[in-house]
């Protein structure tokens, strides 16, 4: 049994280091959509009568919904660090955003743990693994687990850095985040990231690709397009 396990392990490792071993059909394109601070009850298919999420509702209808799933951490960077490393928080050391001494010490129930702001360079990330298998990798939007996604396995990056939010009035161009060029004044960041992702997909449709679309919204500061603000302001409960 040990010999069989060793052979299987060796074949898996060997295969990952030889992308030519796989055909295109063996390497499906991957689009990972990550929405920051979205409540599970804020989706139409989960019962929301206030927020309108028709496209996500259609995704849920055509795909699979996990109703007993949990994030590996309660806030931004730790959850992302676990997602892209496959490690629990004690293993990668990113316990919170900034200092673990944040907040009022009188309400603290634990002794603050030593905290790392970003993933250590020695940690093998999901994008690095996919690159070794022949994927073209891209990040659009929030990264928050390192200063530059290109040092952690990303080939193309738009708007991703160590910043956790776009800053005051930062959802509209001119932007205050890194690695993004300002184009049309007043452009909405969520729309820009979506359009950049679509362009990348069309350009790389013939190659296996990994696209991490990580919107800064609905993370604070809450800044919506005027047309949508008007739509929601007319609803009951505002």
Walk through the language-model features, giving the residues of each.
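Sec-dependent N-terminal signal peptides
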Residues: 4-13
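Formylglycine-dependent sulfatase
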Residues: 2, 16-238
């Amino acid at each position: 049994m040990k010999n069989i396990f060793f052979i299987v392990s060796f074949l898996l490792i060997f295969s990952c280091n030889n992308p030519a071993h796989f055909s295109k059909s063996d390497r499906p394109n991957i689009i990972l959509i990550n929405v920051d601070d979205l409540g599970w009850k804020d989706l139409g298919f989960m019962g929301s009568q206030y927020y309108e999420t028709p496209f996500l509702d259609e995704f849920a209808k055509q795909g699979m919904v996990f109703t007993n799933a949990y994030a590996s951490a309660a806030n931004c960077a730790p959850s992302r660090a676990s997602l892209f490393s496959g490690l629990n928080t004690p293993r990668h050391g990113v316990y919170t955003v900034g200092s673990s001494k944040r907040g009022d010490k009188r309400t603290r129930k634990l002794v603050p743990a030593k905290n790392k702001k970003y993933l250590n360079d020695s940690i093998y990330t999901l994008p690095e693994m996919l690159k070794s298998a022949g994927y073209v990798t891209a990040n659009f939007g929030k990264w928050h687990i390192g200063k530059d996604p290109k040092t952690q396995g990303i080939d193309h990056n738009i708007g991703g850095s160590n910043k956790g939010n776009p800053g005051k009035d930062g959802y509209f161009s001119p932007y205050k985040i890194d690695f993004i060029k300002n184009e049309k004044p007043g452009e909405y960041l969520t729309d820009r990231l979506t359009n950049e992702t679509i362009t990348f997909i069309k350009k790389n449709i013939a190659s296996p690709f990994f696209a991490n679309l990580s919107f800064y919204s609905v993370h604070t500061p809450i800044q919506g397009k005027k047309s949508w603000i008007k739509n929601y302001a007319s609803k009951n409960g505002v």
